[in-house]
């Protein structure tokens, strides 16, 4: 093995380690309702699903793909988030499903920015939609933005259709051949019942024990900085 080949291999191993570190770091963050896993074939592609728990998009189940730049994390290019089904949202491009991230991440800063912040941002712009729109300056879907500003009832009707569409596609076949693609199955009592009961029992045992709050919000009031600590 030549010195150049060795350096290239070492660089690849270190990069993969950094990506794995980013993934493991998700476990320490409050990311309820959003799930991601790196592709088995390509660690630069992550499959994700967002379950919206509040706001006008409540009960929506939105699949997305998170793609990392080739030189991540030592690259000023920001990761790309693309929703797989039609998602009527002012920040989602109606043509290719790309989420507008530049207002939160103008450029990627290694050591300061992390993928959990991107996932938090995704959560925030759906679950806290109106709060975000009150301060948002950029848009990726002018029709959605104008409808939200000028005809709230019509906007909400379009959002409801979007939510129903997302639910209808939950059980669609995987669009890619990847063992890590997140797949959902219809509930089968014989198969899933015991697991459900086990989960219920575990939750019952946790009653009365409240974990400490992380005190995190996506933005601190008056400061457009991802995940500032609240005082």
UniProtKB/Swiss-Prot annotation:
Entries under Gene3D superfamilies matching the protein: Ubiquitin Conjugating Enzyme
CDD domains in the record: UEV_AKTIP
Source organism of this protein record: Culex quinquefasciatus
Domain UBC core: 14-168
PROSITE patterns in UniProt: UBC_2
Family: Belongs to the ubiquitin-conjugating enzyme family. FTS subfamily.
Protein's UniProt name: Protein crossbronx homolog
Organism phylogeny: Eukaryota, Metazoa, Ecdysozoa, Arthropoda, Hexapoda
A Pfam match: UQ_con
Transmembrane segments: none
Coiled-coil stretches: none
């Amino acid at each position: 093995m030549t010195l150049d080949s060795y350096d290239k291999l070492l660089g690849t191993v270190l990069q993969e380690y950094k990506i794995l570190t980013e993934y493991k770091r998700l476990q320490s963050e409050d990311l309820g309702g959003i799930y991601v896993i790196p592709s088995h074939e390509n660690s630069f592609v992550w499959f994700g699903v967002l379950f919206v728990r509040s706001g006008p998009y409540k009960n929506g189940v939105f699949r997305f793909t998170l793609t990392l730049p080739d030189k991540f994390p030592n690259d000023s290019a920001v990761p790309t988030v693309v929703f797989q089904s039609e998602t009527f949202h002012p920040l989602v491009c109606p043509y290719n499903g790309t989420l507008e991230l530049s207002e939160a991440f103008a450029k990627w800063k290694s050591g300061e920015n992390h993928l959990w912040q991107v996932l938090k941002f995704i959560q925030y712009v759906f679950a806290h939609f109106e709060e975000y729109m009150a301060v948002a300056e950029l848009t990726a879907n002018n029709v959605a933005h104008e409808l939200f500003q000028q005809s709230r009832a019509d906007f909400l009707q379009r959002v409801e259709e979007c939510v129903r569409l997302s639910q209808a596609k939950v059980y669609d076949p995987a669009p890619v051949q990847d063992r890590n693609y997140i797949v959902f199955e219809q509930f089968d009592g014989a198969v899933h019942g015991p697991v459900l009961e086990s989960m219920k029992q575990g939750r019952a045992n946790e009653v009365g024990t409240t974990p400490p709050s992380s005190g995190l919000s996506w933005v601190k009031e008056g400061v457009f900085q991802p995940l500032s600590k609240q005082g």
